[in-house]
């Protein structure tokens, strides 16, 4: 497994089977009303992310679910599965749909799914903060991704 740090909470995780998981895409432009900026600016063009297989969104804050970045990505990315915590919060699902995502995989706390041959994802939810963490497991590797919680 290879992990490329893009910026902030955005990682590009590549499995040995070359599946690509993009986390919390904030890739382009400012966030939080121009108060936060990516530094350094991303070295990648939007085409670099054209073959993403999954997107993981940890929570609904703008620096993790960034509309300008989503619009900047190739349009077909909105068809890939979005793995997200199921807080029971309608606003998050409504936001995904408003941003053009239709393939939502909403996981409850401690719920696991297998996304590919021997690639397992387990969701951990912090209900107090409406945030989440993710455990990505393969036969011989575990990666724990935690953001603001």
Regions found by a protein language model. Give the residues of each.
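Catalytic core of the metallo-beta-lactamase
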Residues: 6, 10-17, 114-149
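Active-site environment of divalent metal-dependent phosphoester hydrolases
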Residues: 9, 29-30, 61-65, 89-92, ...
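Pre-active-site segment of Zn-dependent metallo-hydrolases
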Residues: 18-56, 60, 68-72
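Metal-dependent catalytic neighborhoods of phosphoester/phosphodiester hydrolases
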Residues: 66-76, 94-95
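Short internal beta-strands
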Residues: 79-89
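Short, aromatic/basic amphipathic alpha-helical patches
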Residues: 91-103
């Amino acid at each position: 497994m290879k992990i490329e740090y893009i910026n902030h909470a955005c990682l590009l995780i590549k499995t040995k089977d070359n599946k690509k998981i993009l986390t919390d895409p904030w890739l382009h432009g400012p966030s939080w009303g121009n108060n936060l900026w990516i530094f350094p600016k991303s070295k990648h063009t939007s085409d670099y992310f054209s073959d993403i297989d999954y997107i993981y969104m940890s929570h609904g804050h703008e620096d993790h679910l960034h509309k300008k970045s989503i619009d900047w990505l190739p349009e077909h990315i909105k068809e890939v599965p979005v793995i997200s915590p199921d807080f029971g919060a309608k606003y998050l699902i409504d936001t995904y749909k408003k941003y053009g995502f239709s393939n939502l995989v909403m996981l409850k706390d401690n719920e696991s799914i297998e996304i590919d041959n021997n690639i397992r994802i387990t969701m951990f939810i912090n209900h107090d903060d409406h945030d989440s963490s993710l455990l990505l497991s393969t036969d011989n590797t575990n990666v724990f991704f935690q953001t603001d919680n």
